[in-house]
Swiss-Prot record:
Cofactor note: Binds 2 Mg(2+) ions per subunit.
Transmembrane stretches, start-end: none
Protein encoded by which gene: prs
Organism taxonomic ancestry: Archaea, Thermoproteota, Thermoprotei, Sulfolobales, Sulfolobaceae
Main localisation: cytoplasm
One BP annotation, GO: 5-phosphoribose 1-diphosphate biosynthetic process
Role, per record: Involved in the biosynthesis of the central metabolite phospho-alpha-D-ribosyl-1-pyrophosphate (PRPP) via the transfer of pyrophosphoryl group from ATP to 1-hydroxyl of ribose-5-phosphate (Rib-5-P).
Binding-site list for Mg(2+) 1: 127
Listed name of the protein: Ribose-phosphate pyrophosphokinase
Compartment(s) where it occurs, according to its Swiss-Prot or TrEMBL record: Cytoplasm
Record's keyword terms, sorted: ATP-binding, Cytoplasm, Kinase, Magnesium, Metal-binding, Nucleotide biosynthesis, Nucleotide-binding, Transferase
Amino acid sequence: MIIIGGTATNWIDERLSKLLVSRLVKIEHKVFPDGESYIRIPERLMGEDVLVVQSLYPPQDKHLVELFFILETLNDMKANKITVIIPYLAYSRQNRRFKEGEAVSTKTVLNLIKKTGATSLMVVEPHHYEELQYFDGEVKIADPIPDIARVINGKVTNPFVLAPDKGALNRAKRLSQELGCDYSYLEKQRDLTTGEVRVTNLPDLRLDGKEVILVDDIISTGGTMVQASQIAYSKGAKKVIATAVHSLFVENAYDRLINAGIKEIITTNTIPQDTSKVTIVDVSESIARKI
């Protein structure tokens, strides 16, 4: 088994190579003056089983097209089994048609990954598990929640896990089981035109003296986490920590979270981060466990 390090790996390919004791082949890559990408696989891989590591963090479209180039090249080389490992799957939030005429972006992305040569797929903590049915092949999911829980355990003594919306309820349950504490969730409603989010159902939370851990799969603008933090403090929380597997931090999200009283942000390396601002959990071990 050979690991192919793509153009957007954030060192996960190198860590996997060490964990799995597998040879790593790095893609040769450059960008032409007009912005087009060039890739070359520098070894012959006929008959080989390969693991392609390529995350789809911004610029998503560029990294996605480069993944297609890698997969079709491996297919042309007649590699045997081609497993694609995607730490962060872009377009996962557009997994259904919210308005008439909208593209189901997740479906298109996964269909093209299959058609360009992937025989199997692994994703780290997808937005919705159901969306992976669009990939016509073997699918595995890497779960970094136990690894995140180990980091949190060393920071809290009286934890309570809170999902900022119902979609994150399963993650909250899993994290609470790892931490051995209670959990709950908020309900929100998003305006499909403006993107504005508001809490529509507030449970009877008693958080006096609790260290509240907000958990979600993605932090984008941080709006959902900001509201959840404000609610947690209004219910008596002693401290609020935010954790998400994939953190994009767009539109000054980091500053908004800190200004909302969040004392620490724990995330993973599926997307490159500023290590001076956040605590980072490596997802390589969770990926290796599934191979």
